[in-house]
Amino acid sequence: MAEITKFGASEVAFHIKHDLREIPEGKSYGNEAINKEQSCNNYSLLNGRCQTAEEANKYRKELEKEIFKYNRKNLVHAVEVVVQCPVDCPLEQKEDFFRVSYDHICSTLPMGERCVFVAQVHVDERVKDQAGNIILDSHGNPLSKDHLHVMYVPGVPDTKHDGFKYKLCADQLTKRARLKEFHP
């Protein structure tokens, strides 16, 4: 139901573009289940903030200036949580499901909603069987894999470094015990 991925500095921009469906013309999303005609129905939960990949990446970089970072090559600059909507969720409750999921994720982050730079609901991906065929529901409509992408800067409280309230530390936010609190 939920998946967590960590990204280094060089990976973040591409994944923001993927989540916001801003892959350049002629390039592939790497996911053939995406129905591009339905991509216009995807929506953000950020209330006007970070609506383009450029805005989101700029916001992330500005926020990182306020956060202590160790000088490491393998430093995690972003964490993404993908929350899948249950198949049995009634259509009229999907928006509420994603909003409650987003609010819960933000409530577990030391920096709260401020560190989130992508919160995008995808309704444009279809379910395929193992042979690669799109699965249809009882009415002949393609089954949808609606899900929420939340990307955030993994800032945690910092008491060691003067001038910084937070430091980058994805490990503190993605430990097994902490993940079990999110989804036992």
Describe the residue ranges of each PLM region.
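N-terminal nicking endonuclease/strand-transfer module with a His-rich metal-binding environment
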Residues: 1-184
